[in-house]
Regions:
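A short, N-terminal amphipathic alpha-helix
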Residues: 1-8, 20-25, 185-186
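Short, high-confidence coil segments that cap the C-terminus of an alpha-helix
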Residues: 6, 52-54, 82-87, 188
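Hydrophobic/aromatic residues located in beta-strands of well-ordered beta-sheets
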Residues: 9-11, 57, 87-88, 124, ...
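Short phosphate-binding loop-to-helix
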Residues: 10, 16-77
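Active-site-adjacent beta-strand anchor residues
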Residues: 11-12, 33, 154, 204
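Conserved alpha/beta core of the MobA/IspD/sugar-nucleotide pyrophosphorylase nucleotidyltransferase superfamily
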Residues: 52, 127, 141-224
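Conserved core of the sugar-phosphate nucleotidyltransferase
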Residues: 68-167
Length: 224
C-alpha cells in the first residue's frame, strides 16, 4: 500500500468470496459478522479483534477503489493535528463540470455522490445525498464552486470508533443512508479535510451505472 506510515493493512469482510480473493494475493483478512449495518460498524468490529495499540484507524471502503494515497495521509495528519476531532474525512471542492453531473444525476433520480457542508476549522455541519449548499446559479466547467464532494473514507480515534456500534441508528442517518451522520447525531466532531485530486480521476460506486465508468477509469490508470 502506498500510504506512508501505515502500520498494518487488513481487509474486513463477511463474505468468503472476498476472503479467498484477498488471501490469494497475500492480504490479511478479518472475518466480521453479517449483522454489521455499514462499513463503520464492520471497521469497529475488526478493530476490536486486532487490539487497541493504534493511534488512528482508517476505514477505506471497497466502493472507492480510486482513492489516492494522499487522501488517506491527509486524513491521518489532520486528525492527529486536531485533538478536538474524533473522526476525519476528505472533501473535494467541485468544479462546475462535477457539480452539473451531480445535479443531473439527482434530476434523474440517482445519487451522484454525497456533498458536505462545514464551518470554521473544517467542522462538519451536515452531509447529504442532495446537492448542498443550494447555489442558485450555474458555473463554467472549470470554475470552482462552493459545493464539496464528500469522499467515503474515514480516519477514527479508536475510542470514537469503539462506541459507534452501541448507538442506535438516528433519524438523519436513516433518511440519508449516510453512516457518518451517526457521529454528528451523537455530538461527536467530524473534521472535513480538503484534498486535491492532483489530476487523478476519481469516482465512487453509488449506482450500477457507475461500474463501467469506474472500470474505464481504472483501465486508463493501468490498474484494471
Amino acid at each position: 500500500m502506498a500510504v506512508k506510515a501505515a502500520d498494518r493493512v487488513v481487509i474486513a469482510t463477511d463474505d468468503d468470496r472476498i476472503r479467498l480473493a484477498a488471501e490469494a494475493f497475500g492480504a490479511e483478512v478479518v472475518m466480521t459478522s453479517e449483522d454489521c449495518q455499514n462499513g463503520t460498524e464492520r471497521c469497529a468490529e475488526a478493530h476490536s479483534f486486532l487490539g487497541s495499540k493504534y493511534d488512528v484507524v482508517v476505514n477505506l471502503q471497497g466502493d472507492a477503489p480510486l482513492t489516492p494515497h494522499w487522501f488517506v495521509e491527509a486524513l491521518v495528519a489532520g486528525l492527529l493535528a486536531d485533538p478536538g476531532a474524533d473522526i476525519a474525512t476528505p472533501v473535494l471542492r467541485c468544479e462546475g463540470r462535477a457539480l452539473t453531473g451531480f445535479q443531473e444525476d439527482r434530476r434523474a433520480g440517482r445519487v451522484g455522490g454525497t456533498t458536505a457542508v462545514f464551518g470554521a476549522g473544517g467542522r462538519a455541519l451536515y452531509f447529504s445525498k442532495e446537492v448542498i449548499p443550494y447555489t442558485g446559479r450555474t458555473y463554467a466547467d472549470d470554475a470552482p464552486t462552493p459545493v464539496f464532494h464528500h469522499v467515503g473514507v474515514y480516519a477514527f480515534r479508536p475510542a470514537a470508533l469503539a462506541v459507534y456500534p452501541s448507538w442506535p441508528v438516528g433519524p438523519l442517518e436513516k433518511l440519508e443512508g449516510l453512516e457518518q451522520l451517526r457521529f454528528l447525531e451523537n455530538g461527536h466532531t467530524v473534521l472535513c479535510v480538503e484534498v486535491e485530486a492532483r489530476g487523478r480521476q476519481f469516482w465512487e460506486l453509488n449506482n450500477p451505472e457507475d461500474v463501467p465508468k469506474l472500470e474505464a477509469m481504472m483501465a486508463d490508470m493501468g490498474v484494471a
